[in-house]
């Protein structure tokens, strides 16, 4: 079993909120990868970053590959009013957004309320998770939509 002190958490974070030195480190790594003749000394000089900053981050920051983004899987939970055809309405939105349904579960209604849990795959880069949540929130009889998990 892994010791807790050895466990490293990972985060997916947008580039525009990263410190400049981290972004430069990624650019340097990319430059070194695409030009094997480029030295670390010349690369850090080219991107105006200290070698110590480069060495600090180079083994801890990795870009998310475009191929990873091709298969975005996420799970949503919808809180809905129990009406006839509600699940069909939800699936119609999912179909229009060209998402693949991986799993689906509808709870037994209690006091005219139910939940629908959907695991979805968004292969299209044009469809963001925010777009999906927004489209489902706009449905009548949907009181709440929550993202409960996401993987790349």
UniProtKB/Swiss-Prot annotation:
Limits of the ACT domain: 75-150
Gene3D superfamilies the UniProt entry points to: 3.30.70.260
Alphabetical list of InterPro entries matching this protein: ACT-like_dom_sf (IPR045865), ACT_dom (IPR002912), UPF0735_ACT_dom-cont (IPR008310)
Superkingdom of the source species: Bacteria
Classification via HAMAP family: UPF0735
Similarity field: Belongs to the UPF0735 family.
Listed name of the protein: UPF0735 ACT domain-containing protein SaurJH9_1700
């Amino acid at each position: 079993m892994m010791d807790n002190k050895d466990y490293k958490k990972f985060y997916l974070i947008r580039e525009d909120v990263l410190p400049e030195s981290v972004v430069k480190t990624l650019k340097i790594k990319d430059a070194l990868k695409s030009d094997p003749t480029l030295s670390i000394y010349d690369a850090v000089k080219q991107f105006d970053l200290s070698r110590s900053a480069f060495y600090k981050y180079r083994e801890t920051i990795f870009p998310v590959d475009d191929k990873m983004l091709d298969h975005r899987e996420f799970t949503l939970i919808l809180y809905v009013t129990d009406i006839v055809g509600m699940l069909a309405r939800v699936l119609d939105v999912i179909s229009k957004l060209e998402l693949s349904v991986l799993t689906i579960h509808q709870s037994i209604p209690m006091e005219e309320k139910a939940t629908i849990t959907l695991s979805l795959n968004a292969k299209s880069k044009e469809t963001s998770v925010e777009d999906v949540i927004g489209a489902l929130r706009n449905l009548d009889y949907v009181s709440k939509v929550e993202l409960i998990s996401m993987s790349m």
